[in-house]
């Protein structure tokens, strides 16, 4: 049981600590920014604390927007809270998180301290190595929008002693949102984007986790995406309707299109990883999107030092995810190496073409600041510097040769254009015609539309 009282949770110190942790980027419907709230911070903290303890606090309606889903063409609806509401939710989250962490199942990996996607993937691999070869791969249909408020509050009622805390959480659950000028009531679900929502969603689905544990079932869950593993097909087929029946008690159901029973030798995708037999590799579509992101870094207007920061950040990200899945010197590993060379080479070419950096020596010094050791062996890194510069200079010289040829052609074209102009007599004898000058040319227009242009 969580025993701290509301007045122990909400004090000036917890408000100060939580304020430092909330995002300063977005504003809510009241349009009060982080910096504006900060201008009179002491008073705002005191007013917030008093409104909570007196029970007069009411959250602002949320601002509903849509953002791109990672690695997808789909949109995700999220709701933006005001700075004050985010602050209050952060205090609640910081207070409740540690208690609920002790109650959660260890096979739940999303939104938790010391848990991660990689750990979920490794746990899945462990179960497969234990010869649990039959997999029920599924997720919950429209999960975040389907959480039953009454049932969630009943769960909280059994865990939290001070009912004022539950009442406060209930306010956040019930607060609706505006999308443009339309108001949407919020009678079920948690707001995606709210600070409390990940914790509340885990609290709700922990009931399923405990049910699976009681049934002695192996599973790995990451939010609403999960796999259940069995030693034989019969057990998998038998258990599926049992799971569906249990989920009905939570007003949830499996998403039919994403639910299948398969043998590991036929493969399945979970958390962006393709499991086939005892092997695993990154889903190709996801990898290609990551490679495209890498190439886009070289196409930005960043200077070379800014490019180095961005490419190092990218390399750090793939080290913490992709390289923990992909085998060294596998096809996917070699693909990442190849595209890194192409990306950096293109940036060297653009920088050389812009005459910002002129010598190979300068480029080598800059290249040494890139974390090549994440993808390459130390012994081969110097060779990669040479390869990158060689490719870039080859492209630069080819492009320069093309431009020189184009200049010669343009010069000859202009010679003849001027000759024709000198031999031409311009007659303007029609109503609606006008004569003007534009870009070193006489331009004849008829009612504003260009009819003829002659260089001079």
Model-predicted regions and their roles:
Residues 23-30, 71, 100-104, 134, ...:
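Short acidic (Asp/Glu) and glycine-rich catalytic loops that position anionic groups and cofactors
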Residues 1-161, 176-186, 192, 430-456:
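Conserved two-metal-ion catalytic palm core of "right-hand" nucleic acid polymerases
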Residues 110-121, 229-233, 338-349:
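Short, mixed-charge aromatic SLiMs
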Residues 269, 274-456:
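Active-site and adjacent loop segments of nucleotide-processing enzymes
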Residues 47, 90-95, 123, 151, ...:
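Long, highly charged amphipathic alpha-helices
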Residues 86, 90, 94, 98, ...:
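Short, residue-level hotspots on alpha-helical faces of the histone-fold
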Residues 51-52, 61, 65, 106-107, ...:
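Conserved polymerase palm-domain catalytic core
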């Amino acid at each position: 049981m969580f025993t701290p009282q509301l007045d122990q949770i909400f004090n000036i110190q917890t408000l100060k600590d939580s304020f430092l942790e909330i995002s300063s980027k977005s504003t809510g419907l009241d349009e009060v920014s982080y910096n504006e709230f900060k201008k009179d911070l002491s008073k705002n903290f005191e007013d917030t604390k008093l409104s909570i303890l007196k029970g007069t606090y009411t959250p602002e309606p949320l601002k509903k927007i849509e953002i791109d889903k990672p690695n997808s063409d789909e949109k995700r609806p999220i709701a933006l809270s005001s700075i004050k509401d985010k602050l209050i939710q952060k205090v609640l989250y910081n207070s409740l998180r540690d208690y609920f962490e002790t109650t959660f199942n260890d096979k739940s990996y999303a939104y938790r301290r010391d848990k991660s996607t990689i750990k979920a993937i490794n746990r899945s691999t462990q179960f497969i190595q234990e010869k649990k070869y039959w997999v029920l791969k599924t997720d919950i249909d429209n999960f975040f929008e389907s959480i039953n408020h009454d049932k969630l509050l009943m769960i909280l009622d059994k865990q939290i002693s001070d009912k004022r805390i539950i009442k406060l959480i209930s306010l956040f659950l019930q607060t609706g949102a505006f999308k443009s000028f339309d108001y949407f009531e919020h009678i079920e679900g948690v707001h995606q984007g709210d600070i409390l929502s990940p914790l509340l969603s885990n609290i709700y689905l922990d009931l399923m986790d405990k049910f699976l544990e009681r049934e002695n079932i192996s599973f790995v869950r990451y939010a609403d995406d999960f796999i259940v593993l069995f030693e034989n097909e019969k057990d998998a087929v038998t258990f599926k309707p049992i799971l569906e029946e249990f989920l009905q008690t939570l007003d949830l159901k499996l998403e039919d299109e994403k639910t299948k029973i398969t043998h590991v030798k036929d493969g399945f995708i979970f958390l962006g990883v393709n499991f086939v037999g005892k092997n695993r590799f990154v889903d190709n579509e996801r990898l290609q999107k990551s490679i495209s992101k890498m190439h886009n870094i070289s196409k930005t207007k960043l200077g070379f030092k800014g490019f180095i920061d961005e490419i190092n950040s990218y390399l750090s990200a793939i080290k913490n995810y992709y390289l923990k899945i992909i085998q060294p010197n596998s096809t996917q590993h070699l693909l990442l190496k190849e595209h890194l060379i192409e990306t950096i080479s293109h940036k060297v070419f653009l920088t050389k073409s812009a005459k910002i950096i002129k010598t190979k020596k300068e480029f080598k010094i800059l290249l040494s600041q890139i974390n090549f050791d994440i993808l390459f062996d130390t012994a081969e890194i110097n060779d990669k510097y040479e390869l990158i510069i060689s490719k870039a200079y080859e492209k630069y010289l080819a492009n320069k040769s093309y431009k020189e040829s184009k200049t010669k052609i343009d010069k000859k074209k202009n010679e003849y254009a001027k000759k024709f102009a000198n031999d031409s007599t311009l007659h303007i004898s029609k109503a609606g015609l006008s004569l003007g000058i534009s870009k070193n040319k006489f331009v004849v227009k008829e009612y504003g539309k260009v009819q003829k242009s002659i260089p001079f």
